[in-house]
Every structure is written in structure tokens, then in C-alpha cells.
């Protein structure tokens, strides 16, 4: 079995050969959890792939909502990415400092959400790039505003109200990207949470089961991803909504599913940061 959408994932070799292509734009999306003692923007300022701009998921967000990095209104997204020099005609290559789950997949999903489909991930991200001793820089590229049009695809995102309603209808499979311990309610959440456990009826597919943790978090083969999906009991012929802690690693699941042909997996944007503190959300624990 091969990837259905192989162009969504580019290799470090491919990017090195296309660094000077005029229509390609690199985006560094590195982001860290509160308390990790690291800052994505600072790391970008120290070293990044030549020509890359920094995309801050906490800045390009709806700051009126008291939840981490919720999606912004379409006009704000368009305004922010224009100022980064990202436009309609660009092929956008997104990476981060840990292979792809420190927000690179989130940014890939966001561009698709707002209608820009010519976007892909760098497999292995910055760690693989550095391991191969490819060029880096610490200077910001010259940026000029580009024309970017947001056309929001609401089929790719879910609200808490929609996920609550789905518990009754069961129309969509809800897939949780968190660890097994967090899913079962046996491990604490990294962010404040009044509840532990999982959304009733959801299935657990930890995001790292789709990746190679010992190989710079590159994505597994199509056969391996399909096997992990099958083992979790997921039916690829039915609609899927991915969830996680705050809407970041859920996008790893959405991306992995996209690679093997399930192209319209939605992401529950608030994820457990919202569900675990909402007064009206039921919770299950255990398997």
C-alpha cells in the first residue's frame, strides 16, 4: 500500500533541492506546552531553515476565547499570513523542531481549513534536517505582503456543541490522539482540567503510533498507519473527528489519515482543554 496523497509529505532531500524555488515558502511552526521551559520563537531566532518564516499558533489565534490557540476568524488568518509573505500562489512547506507534532501538523490543517490546499509537511522536520547537516540561518528573511484569500472549509472543524450532539447521533467517529493513560483517566492532563478521561464513545489512537519516534518522528508507511487505524477499530468509510489535549496532535491524526486517503477528518478545536472544563460535557474513564 502506498500513500494516497504522497505530495502532502516532502523529504529533506526534496526541500534541499527546491530551497531556491520562487513559489515555495517554508514555515517554522515550532511551539511548546506551557511549563516546558522552551519557546518556539526564540528557537526560530537561533536557527531555522533558510528562508523560513515563523508561524506562531498562539498569535494567529482567536484571543477572545479563553482556550489555547483556537482558530481565528478568516480575516485575521488572512491578514497574519499575508504579513508573513505567504500568498495564494505559494506551495507552503511546514516544519517544526520535533519532526511534526509540535504544531507543524496543526498549521498544515489550518491552511487547509482556510482554503489553501497547496501545503505540505517536511518529514522529520528540523531535527532530521540538522542531523543531515543541511544549511540553517539565524536571520529573518525579507518579507513583503502577499495576497491571501481565506475560504473557510467548516467541514474540517468541530465545536463542543457539535461533539456533544454527536454522542447521541453517533454519526461521526471521535478519535482521541492523547496517550492511553490520559484517555483512560489514569494520568493527569498537562493543562488544568476539572475532569479526566475521554469523550463517551471515542476511540484512542495515540498520535505517535503514526510516527517513528526514534527516527525524528517521521511518518510511518501507509501500511503501518493503516494497521494502527485498524487496530484502534476505526472505520475509514465513516466520518471522523479527531481530538487531543488542545487541538494540536489531533492534527497529526488528521494528517496521517489524509496520507492514506481519508481526506476530510475534522478536528475538535477546543479538544480536552475545553471538554475537561466545560459544565455540560460527559466523561468516560477506562478503555
Model-derived segments and their meaning:
Residues 1-287:
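Cytosolic catalytic domains that perform sulfur/thiol-centered chemistry
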Amino acid at each position: 500500500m502506498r500513500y494516497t496523497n504522497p505530495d502532502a509529505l516532502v523529504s529533506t532531500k526534496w526541500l534541499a533541492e527546491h530551497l531556491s524555488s520562487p513559489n515555495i515558502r517554508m514555515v517554522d511552526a515550532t511551539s511548546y506546552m506551557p511549563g516546558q521551559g522552551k519557546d518556539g520563537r526564540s528557537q526560530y531566532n537561533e536557527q531555522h531553515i533558510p528562508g523560513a518564516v515563523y508561524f506562531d499558533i498562539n498569535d494567529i489565534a482567536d484571543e477572545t476565547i479563553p482556550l489555547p490557540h483556537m482558530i481565528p476568524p478568516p480575516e485575521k488568518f488572512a491578514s497574519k499570513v499575508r504579513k508573513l509573505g505567504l500568498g495564494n500562489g505559494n506551495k507552503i512547506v511546514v516544519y517544526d523542531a520535533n519532526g511534526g507534532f509540535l504544531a507543524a501538523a496543526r498549521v498544515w490543517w489550518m491552511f487547509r481549513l482556510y482554503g489553501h490546499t497547496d501545503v505540505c509537511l517536511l518529514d522529520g522536520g528540523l531535527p532530521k534536517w540538522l542531523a543531515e547537516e543541511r544549511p540553517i540561518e539565524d536571520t529573518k528573511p525579507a518579507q513583503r505582503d502577499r495576497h491571501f484569500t481565506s475560504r473557510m472549509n467548516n467541514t474540517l472543524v468541530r465545536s463542543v456543541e457539535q461533539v456533544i450532539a454527536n454522542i447521541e447521533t453517533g454519526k461521526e467517529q471521535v478519535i482521541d490522539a492523547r496517550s492511553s493513560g490520559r484517555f483512560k483517566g489514569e494520568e493527569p492532563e498537562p493543562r488544568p482540567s476539572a475532569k479526566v478521561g475521554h469523550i463517551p464513545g471515542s476511540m484512542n489512537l495515540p498520535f505517535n503510533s503514526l510516527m517513528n519516534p526514534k527516527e525524528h518522528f517521521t511518518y510511518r508507511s501507509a501500511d503501518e498507519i493503516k494497521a494502527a487505524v485498524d487496530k484502534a477499530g476505526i472505520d475509514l468509510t465513516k466520518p471522523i473527528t479527531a481530538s487531543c489535549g488542545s487541538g494540536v496532535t489531533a492534527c497529526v491524526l488528521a494528517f496521517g489519515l489524509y496520507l492514506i486517503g481519508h481526506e476530510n477528518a475534522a478536528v475538535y478545536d477546543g479538544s480536552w482543554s475545553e471538554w475537561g472544563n466545560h459544565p455540560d460535557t460527559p466523561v468516560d474513564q477506562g478503555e
